[in-house]
Curated annotation (Swiss-Prot):
The keyword Lipid metabolism does not apply. HAMAP family: RuBisCO_L_type1. It comes from Sesamum indicum (Oriental sesame). This is Ribulose bisphosphate carboxylase large chain. One of its GO terms (biological process) is photorespiration. Heterohexadecamer of 8 large chains and 8 small chains; disulfide-linked. The disulfide link is formed within the large subunit homodimers. Its cofactor is Mg(2+).
Length: 443
């Protein structure tokens, strides 16, 4: 069975048992009344069952309801169909004030019907010939308004300075100021020029997201013809069906696939309604993607440390044990489905490098947009500063240093021999984002 953990807030006067049974019925075989065609099928075989209800600590009217769904309810290899049932009409049910899907346990038999990520972590490292450290990226800013040639120039400077990747912003598709084909051509030129100068393999996440699946595939095919290593998709706004098709194309044609999660906070940020990001991350691992943005813990966007580390384990590891202290409600066995590299992006800079290295480990992408392009000397020195800071943090971690305690000292020491890093340290020494997270663990 597929197991689901729902956070249920019933309307006043509705007992939790009734609310849990309603969730199980409405998201599987049930409707609002008894119908004569019920007698033509084996309801006991197909109906969802609410098998456990727990009160939420510290809340008077919230419950975690556990529901089991028979596997025969779902089409094989279709995240779209799975979500249509489990998070469909039931979320508008009048008997509930709010409903949130906290976690899913996907059985191994169902996992095996999915291709999953096009390549996975090890294959990506082998393609790039980069080992033993996080990868470095940069989102090109301003996100909208640059011409294709200026955009390509910004990519080249960042890649030449030492970054592994540059990135289209999620809302860069094919607008009047920069059509997609022009951007792809100038970015490919930037990649090849930077590779020739540095001797390293470089990439730019070319955003293939489009208004139709046919147009999306046309962009992916053009990227492959240019010989670039990686493309990108906005998987929530683009949709799971489009994403799965693109992931299959990427595996067949040797392209890495970077996934952006634009729109996720509409779904996952409120604590009592919607869907926790760990569910979206599991769905992405099944649908397919080699990278996905997972929060930073230390940057400008929402993300509590323990919850974020729970996402990261679910994305990368083959087997993840139940651990309620990190928001993981079920043990998940991925049966060798390739892993997804978590991407930390949003309001991060060189002072965050030791903390990011300690939190995310080697198998991650650390992405500095403003933290590269905001360098007072330009894009290439900004990239140099990030590469030096990463090298210093990775060397200190390998030598057994405590990055959480000694991080600032490590960066200060490295800045003594890197003027680019010293300038970056001076610019961002006062920048902090100190706000309480909205989506927190139950105490």
């Amino acid at each position: 069975d597929i197991l689901a953990a729902f956070r249920v807030t019933p309307q006043p006067g509705v007992p939790p048992e009734e609310a849990g049974x309603x969730v199980a019925a409405e998201s599987s075989t049930g409707t609002w009344t008894t119908v004569w065609t019920d007698g033509l099928t084996s309801l006991d075989r197909y109906k969802g069952r609410c098998y456990n209800i727990e009160p939420v600590p510290g809340e008077t009217d919230q419950y975690i309801c556990y529901v089991a769904y028979p596997l025969d309810l779902f089409e094989e290899g279709s995240v779209t169909n799975m979500f249509t049932s489990i998070v469909g009409n039931v979320f508008g049910f009048k008997a509930l004030r709010a409903l949130r899907l906290e976690d899913l346990r996907i059985p191994t038999a169902y996992v095996k019907t999915f291709q999953g990520p096009p390549h996975g972590i090890q294959v990506e490292r082998d393609k790039l010939n980069k080992y033993g450290r996080p990868l470095l990226g940069c989102t090109i800013k301003p996100k909208l308004g640059l011409s294709a040639k200026n955009y390509g120039r910004a990519c080249y400077e960042c890649l030449r300075g030492g970054l592994d990747f540059t990135k289209d912003d999620e809302n860069v598709n094919s607008q009047p100021f920069m059509r997609w084909r022009d951007r792809f051509l100038f970015c490919a030129e930037a990649i090849y020029k930077a590779q020739a100068e540095t001797g390293e393999i470089k990439g730019h996440y070319l955003n293939a997201t489009a208004g139709t699946c046919e147009e999306m595939m046309k962009r992916a095919i053009f990227a492959r013809e240019l010989g670039v290593p990686i493309i990108m998709h906005d998987y929530l706004t683009g949709g799971f069906t489009a994403n799965t098709s693109l992931a299959h194309y990427c595996r067949d044609n040797g392209l890495l696939l970077h996934i952006h999660r634009a729109m996720h906070a509409v779904i996952d940020r409120q604590k009592n309604h919607g869907m926790x990001f760990r569910v979206l991350x599991k769905a992405l691992r099944m649908s397919g993607g080699d990278h996905i943005h997972s929060g930073t813990v230390v940057g400008k966007l929402e993300g509590e440390r323990d919850i974020t580390l729970g996402f990261v384990d679910l994305l990368r590891d083959d087997f993840v044990e139940k651990d309620r202290s990190r928001g993981i409600y079920f043990t998940q066995d991925w049966v060798s489905l390739p892993g997804v590299i978590p991407v930390a992006s949003g309001g991060i800079h060189v002072w965050h490098m030791p903390a990011l290295t300690e939190i995310f480990g080697d198998d991650s992408v650390l992405q500095f947009g403003g933290g590269t392009l905001g360098h007072p000397w330009g894009n290439a020195p900004g990239a140099v500063a990030n590469r030096v800071a990463l090298x210093x943090x990775x060397x200190x971690x390998n030598x057994g240093x405590d990055l959480a305690a000694e991080g600032n000292a490590i960066i200060r020491e490295a800045s003594k021999w890197s003027p680019e890093l010293a300038a970056a340290c001076e610019v961002w020494k006062e920048i902090k984002f100190k706000f309480k997270a909205v989506d927190t663990l139950d105490k």
